Amino acid sequence: MAKQSPIPDALDKPFYDACNEERLVIQYCANCLRYQFPPRPECTRCGNNASVEWQQLSGRGRIISRVVVHDTPTSSLIPGQPFNVAVIALDEEPEVTMLSHLPGTPVDQVPIGAAVEVIFETTSATGQKVPEWRVVG
């Protein structure tokens, strides 16, 4: 499936730079000891901006929900229909979630609760790598 190419800004550039190195990083607040995603200028829990830093994660999680898209309005995704969209809870902080198309997983075989690990796919328009997830158990 074609991947949309993100255009990183100053706030999410560290995230996408790490993706290009095939590392998964998200923000962590050293003040309240919590992870957060997507990136924000300050901690979404305590409001502190001086204590927010980027930390590398294990790249493991679990599928907590999913849908199958049969009719997308996004023209670049139409050739890949139907496709999965899964919600992934990160092992380090299950309250923090990411979305994935689960490349290589048939639309009728997405097990809720299954373990997943991050992989990185290259977008065709810019060459930017983006995180995706694959089922491992």
Where are these regions (language model features)?
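Short functional micro-motifs and their immediate structural scaffolds
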Residues: 37, 51-53
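Flexible extramembrane loops and terminal tails that flank transmembrane helices
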Residues: 1-24
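Cysteine-rich micro-motifs
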Residues: 41-48
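Glycine-rich active-site loops that engage anionic ligands at enzyme catalytic sites
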Residues: 64-103
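Well-ordered alpha/beta subsegment
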Residues: 93, 98-137
